Each structure stands twice: as C-alpha cells, then as structure tokens.
Amino acid sequence: MKAIQIEKNGGPEVLNFVDLAVPQPKPNEVLVKISAAGINFIDIYFREGMYPRALPFVDGQEASGVVSALGSEVTSFKVGDRVAYTGVLGAYAEFAVVPAGRLVRVPQGITDHQAAAAMLQGMTAHYLVHDAFPLQKGQTALIHAAAGGVGLLLVQMAKDIGARVIATVGTEEKAKLARGAGADEVILYKEQDFEVETKRIMDGKGVDVIYDGVGKTTFEQDLNLLRPRGYLICFGAASGPVPPFDLQRLAPKGSLFLTRPSLMHYIASSEELQRRAADVLGMIEAGKLKLRIEHVYPLKDAQQAQRDLAGRKTTGKLLLIP
C-alpha cells in the first residue's frame, strides 16, 4: 500500500511517500480501507517530535473508510461497513488498523469527506463548548482562529447554544467566513489589537471564556480579557507552545481558570466516543453544523498540505485522498 511514513522528526520534507505492506489486524482490531484522511495540527506536532513517537511511523490520526477485514474477536462490525475514527496514528495511508472500540459508524446521510472532516475537529469543538467549559445561553466567548477548521465549528456550536461570539481572524476573507458561521463581532488581529478591541466591544468587562488554539502569541493578552473566574481553554498551539507559566498570576487577575485539554480525554471511553460522535454527525445531518472542506490533496502531496496548514493559508478543513 501507499503511505506517508516519517523516519525522522523534522519539517514537511520528512513526510515520505512510500510503499508498505498492508497491516494485519490483531484480534480486537479492524482493517480499514481509507477513503479520506483529515489533516490536523496534531499531525505536525507528531512530525516535529513535540509529541514523541517511536520511529518510523505513519502520520495522521483521523479518517473515514470501509471495513476491509476483521480481527478474530471483532463482532461489532462487518466487512463493507462505513466507519470513521480519530486518535489512532496511521491514517495517511491506503489502509490502517484501528481498535474496534475506536470506530464509529458513518450514517447514510454523511459523505466520506464529511465523516473524515468531522471526527477530530468536530468532536473537539463539541467537547470544548459542552464539557471543557459548558457554555450557556447569554454568555460571551472569544474564539481565536475562528475561520480555521475547529474555529468555524466552534462559532456555529456556540451560536447554536445561544452564546455571544467574538471572533479573531487574520484576513477580511476569513472575517467573512466567521461572520457567515454566526460570529457577532469579528476582529482582524493583523490590523487591530485584539485585546484593545475586545475590551472596547465588552465595555471593559471580561468575557466568560476564551477558546484558544493559537497558543504562544495570544496567551498573555488572553489573561487580560477574562471576567473574574473566567476560563481560558488552551486547546492548541498553532503559534508554538505556551512558555512555562506561574500559576500565582491567576489569582490577582480574578481567580481565573486555565486548562490545556485534549480530545482524547473526552472520548476515552467507547460510550463517550459514540455519544459525542453521534451528536456531531447528527448536527451535520440536521443542517445545524456546516463543514467547510477547503482543499482535497492526493496522498502524495502530504508535504504541501501540511505546509499550507502550518502557514495559516487555509480555512476550514483539509483532506488527503489515498
């Protein structure tokens, strides 16, 4: 099979397009023929070595596909079932083996591309607004990178709840996308200081929660924008990881809450995974959640796909097709 293998950590150039043997499922695993694989910042973190992984490995951990073979102990699926998953490395390939307990069924009304696009980013947006900080009607959320893959979904989910959304984006094109997703106020951070603008919009009051997937370049200003006992949810590090931080600073700023959550801890059990996936896919089927799939790349172009994502040149979701 064709696959994208990493033999050493580094830049996009270490993404090698290679021939590998088709993996064989263990007793509790399923062999999935990949239809589409999602491209995410976490793939870059693994490639760079921010998240250590034994080498070599096949990058990517989000995909949709069709069951091709079953391990001897798997009874919950059959060959030909349409499935999707996230959280298991190996998606940048024609085939991948996935533990049966990590797979979700894809409803008939959801396309392969939609399923691949919804797993990691859709469930991330879902746990952020429902669990990391259970957003309520009438509250105000500041959402960074609001035209990105997670950002556009966060805006839509926050508005579905009835919250007020202040969004930050880098360009006017991205501002239009954020407004189209429902953002009440949009700040172009390259032209305006987002801290100054947010304080103006809020009449000097703090927001209830900040959803920040940017990291290093926004963190310090975020701390100045929360109400007393407000929440800063740092769920990503697109600009780099946040430097070591003195927790004592949270008290004088209003007894703030700070967390660095990961999706994997919010889909740790099969029951929670199935419930969260069903909610997200159900919102898509009902038309409440619109996915923006900006670009689809052939598998061999994984290097360019990750360059485009890291360069903040993209909006919405990027996919690889084996």
Could you describe each region identified by the protein language model?
Residues V150:
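Hydrophobic/small residue at the entry helix of a nucleotide-binding pocket
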Residues K159-T218, S269-E272:
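Adenosine-nucleotide cofactor-binding segment
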Residues S270-P322:
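C-terminal hydrophobic helical "lid"/dimerization subdomain
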Residues Y45, Y85-A147:
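NAD(P)H dinucleotide-binding glycine-rich loop of Rossmann-like/cofactor-binding domains
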Residues V169-E172, T217-K288, P322:
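Glycine-rich phosphate-binding loop and adjacent beta-alpha segment
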Residues R82, T140, R164, G230-Y231, ...:
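Short glycine-centered segments of the SAM/dcSAM-binding site in methyltransferase folds
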Residues A21-G38, E48-G90:
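Glycine-rich beta-strand-centered segment in the early N-terminal region that forms part
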